[in-house]
């Protein structure tokens, strides 16, 4: 006779199953399990007296015979494509199976074979996501990498050379020399990395040189002069060499207005940074560019979400980052023109509608590198509280909203930058960059981070203790972050032209280098669950934002989840 246990006892032993609901941390966001790939009564679990033992859940199959290197058991996957319970198999640093793990000699329906060479990670009671992707990094200091990793971000793309004045303001690694040095520095950093060259030039030669030197994209920034001529030249080189172009448009409207920038883009694919405008861009109406089909619009996290403190902290941040002088009235006026409560409030709603598609940090240049995922789900929480359930959701769960928001920090930045064949989702064939979260800490503090199939970061107690759990428990780098294990666990992204020019060998790089691809063929319609194209307008006097004729406005949050309850500040 089969043995029956209560739903609560089952969840406590094997994790939640189909129909179970979970609150994410201290938010109002509720997740419901859509499908369970494991088999009731035949689940695999590691431990004394448990299932993964020789002749039981562990087969005799060798690694060469098909057994996986690692199995993550009974994890609850949250990704853009679904919310499912499954075992996950990892081999050679890649995801090779999502389904039912075990011993096919005695168990039915096994799709992931456990053998003597298989390690086990207990996913029961944990949420599993793809590693986050942050595509707006100012590489000001290498300590950012550890902070990002501690938040669940495993891929960083951007520009910079360290705390140079140019890097403090712009995400550009200018010129072949600096690109080479940053690619060499990446060898010791335990995340995937890609670097943007400076895109501000009116003729192609210097831009092509940077792409051949190893840039994975080009960045147009107003502080270097984002003129229509520079926009056109940069996009022309990008189209020729298949790299993405990111743009920070002209706040002062010196070389033209938003309509002139749209005209200069000529319908070509472009990733617009901080599309609301507080981070920089045509004042006051750059936000309306999110209605263009060729534009991939992103936000940076200082305006995520709109709170009672958002406006107050922005002015000083902006003055420092852009090398402005508070004694010069024109500099102060420049800064103040970028900070508008109306457009920041509208940005919240545009994210909830799926009209803004990506969230990134703007690290140490107004944004916080360790808060990308936190700010994303704070925004989702605020929108549920203020706007209620999405039409696709119900009173039972917020599944569609959760998929929409997780896509903003995983698959969509990967698609935008031509790396989605490698990273950005929990799918077979992709690099095993995975994050395990306890539900009570979702979005704020990962329990464990897997990088290229090996554990790179984890919550860990006193190293001198008799067991791993005694305090102080905090996030620490693990073995995949050290020695020669680091290089095979990580990817460096660059242009196909650089790969063909053998930059990897010329610079002595040991990491796996991958060419970005298909960056010029994507439009907003390719971005998962975030492809809305509203007809946008902005009142030039009041700064009120309208989408399809509807005023977009909301109140600032007074209190947020994923905040002081979790932080000793």
From Swiss-Prot:
GO terms for molecular function: nickel cation binding; urease activity. SUPFAM superfamilies: Composite domain of metallo-dependent hydrolases (SSF51338), Metallo-dependent hydrolases (SSF51556). Its cofactor is Ni cation. It holds the Pfam family Urease_alpha. It is an enzyme of class 3 (hydrolase). The active site is at 322 (proton donor). Ni(2+) 2 binds at residues 219, 248, 274. Ni(2+) 1 binds at residues 136, 138, 219, 362. One of its GO terms (biological process) is urea catabolic process. It catalyses: urea + 2 H2O + H(+) = hydrogencarbonate + 2 NH4(+). Binds 2 nickel ions per subunit. This is Urease subunit alpha.
């Amino acid at each position: 006779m089969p043995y029956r246990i209560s739903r609560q006892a089952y969840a406590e032993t094997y994790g939640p199953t189909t129909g179970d609901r979970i609150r994410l941390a201290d938010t109002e966001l509720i997740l419901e399990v859509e499908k369970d790939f494991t088999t009731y009564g035949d689940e695999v679990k590691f431990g004394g007296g448990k299932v993964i033992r020789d002749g039981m859940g562990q087969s005799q199959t060798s690694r060469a015979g098909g057994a996986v290197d690692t199995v993550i058991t009974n994890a609850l996957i949250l990704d853009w494509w679904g919310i499912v319970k499954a075992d996950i198999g990892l081999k050679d640093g890649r995801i090779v199976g999502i389904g039912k793990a075990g011993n096919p000699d005695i168990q039915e329906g096994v799709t992931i074979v456990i053998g003597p060479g298989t390690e086990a990670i207990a996913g029961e009671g944990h949420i599993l996501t793809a590693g986050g992707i942050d595509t707006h990094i100012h590489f000001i200091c290498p300590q950012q990498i550890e902070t990002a990793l501690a938040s669940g971000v495993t891929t960083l793309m951007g520009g910079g050379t360290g705390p140079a004045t140019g890097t403090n303001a712009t995400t550009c690694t200018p010129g072949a020399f600096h690109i080479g040095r940053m690619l060499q520095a990446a060898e010791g950093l335990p995340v995937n990395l890609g670097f943007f060259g400076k895109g501000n030039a009116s003729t192609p030669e210097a831009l092509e040189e940077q792409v051949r030197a190893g840039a994975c994209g080009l960045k147009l920034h107003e502080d270097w002069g984002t003129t229509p001529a520079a926009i056109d030249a940069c996009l022309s080189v990008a189209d020729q060499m298949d790299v993405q172009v990111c743009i920070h448009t002209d706040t002062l409207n010196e070389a033209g207005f938003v309509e002139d920038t749209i005209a200069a883009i000529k319908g070509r694919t472009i990733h617009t940074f901080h599309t609301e405008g507080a981070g920089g861009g045509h004042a006051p109406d750059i936000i309306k560019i999110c209605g263009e089909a060729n534009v991939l619009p992103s936000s940076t996290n200082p305006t995520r979400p709109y709170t009672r403190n958002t406006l107050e902290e922005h002015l000083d941040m902006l003055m420092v980052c852009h090398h402005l002088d508070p004694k010069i009235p024109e500099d102060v006026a420049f800064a103040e023109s970028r900070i508008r409560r109306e457009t920041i409030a509208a940005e919240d709603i545009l994210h909830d509608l799926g009209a803004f598609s990506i969230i990134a940090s703007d690290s140490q240049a107004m944004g916080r590198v360790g808060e990308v995922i936190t700010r994303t789900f704070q925004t989702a929480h605020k929108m549920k509280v203020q706007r209620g359930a999405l039409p696709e959701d119900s009173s039972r769960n917020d599944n569609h909203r959760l998929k929409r928001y997780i896509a903003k920090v995983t698959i969509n930045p990967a698609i935008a930058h031509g790396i989605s064949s490698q990273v950005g989702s929990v799918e077979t064939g992709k690099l095993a960059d995975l994050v395990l979260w306890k539900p009570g800490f979702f979005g704020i503090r990962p329990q464990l981070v897997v990088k290229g199939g090996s554990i790179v970061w984890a919550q860990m107690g006193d190293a001198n203790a008799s067991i791993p759990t005694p305090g102080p428990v905090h996030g620490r780098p693990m073995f995949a972050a050290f020695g020669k294990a680091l290089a095979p666990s990580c990817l460096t992204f660059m242009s196909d032209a650089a790969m063909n020019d053998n930059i990897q060998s010329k610079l002595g790089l040991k990491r796996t280098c991958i060419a970005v691809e298909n960056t010029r063929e994507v439009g907003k319609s390719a971005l998962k669950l975030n492809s809305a194209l509203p007809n946008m307008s902005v009142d030039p006097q009041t700064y009120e934002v309208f989408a399809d004729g509807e005023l977009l406005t909301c109140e600032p949050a007074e209190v947020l989840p994923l905040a002081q309850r979790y932080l000793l500040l």
